[in-house]
């Protein structure tokens, strides 16, 4: 167990735990939350000393950015007790020679072990899974935790939509702040970008870009993770980490913010009994509303295809 760092006379009311926080994505989540002073942060990782070191490094940024958040790290889950939100970034990437089923089962076993500890120490928390394959891992956490569906929320659509917004802004040479875009469906090849509902300062992009350019943007969005992996040699971490942090901020500040997230559906969008990326309202209670958009026939067909692909993954882990 790494060293603890106590603050003098300062008590934060919020606590966020990042499991797998010594890794790139987890450390980015932890740093963002601490630097914004959203909560105290606990980094839990099987790499005990690394977790303590990452926590100390982030803690030492706090005087520079003007944050009084406490950041501690280690392998002991007891530090995470009574967390408001637990972000789970634990998981292994697919390695050469590893089948999809092998990857699923390895990460399922990791999620099982993590979920048991999270439920033990923070039975009232909201869990935000980040590990891939995202929607299947959400299903595992939901079933294993016994939590209501409002309190298990997967990070996927925020990242995919951010990528789409980036590519639209680059194409039109406009501020990304003017760009709004939604990507629904599973976090993978079958994701469903919705250009019809994507806008720049309220103007539909269908009025600003040709179909060919829009199709190219949608394809680049779907390939966004692979593009970075090809360039860097490993998975992205800054954008995924900030995406999870945005969700945590919406929850802790009770923002009632509408974001695309992986949610357990009970008939919405014609999907029942599984996780899928849809627009949700995030607030203090987690998912406070699932927003149902009227989809065109081709959009619904694409979403159905995406749901079917996610179900295939879920069936592998028998959840």
Label each PLM-derived region with a short phrase:
Residues 145-151, 159-319:
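C-terminal substrate-binding/catalytic lobe of Rossmann-fold NAD(P)-dependent dehydrogenases
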Residues 26-27:
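N-terminal Rossmann-fold NAD(P) dinucleotide-binding loop
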Residues 22:
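Conserved glycine-rich cofactor-binding loop
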Residues 18-19, 43:
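Hydrophobic Val/Ile/Leu positions in short beta-strands of Rossmann-like dinucleotide-binding domains
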Residues 63-125:
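Rossmann-like NAD(P)-binding element
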Residues 99-165:
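Rossmann-like NAD(P)(H) cofactor-binding subdomain of soluble oxidoreductases
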Residues 1-11:
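Short, Lys/Arg-enriched N-terminal segments with co-localized hydrophobic residues
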Residues 13, 40, 44-83, 311-319:
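Conserved N-terminal Rossmann-fold NAD(P) cofactor-binding segment
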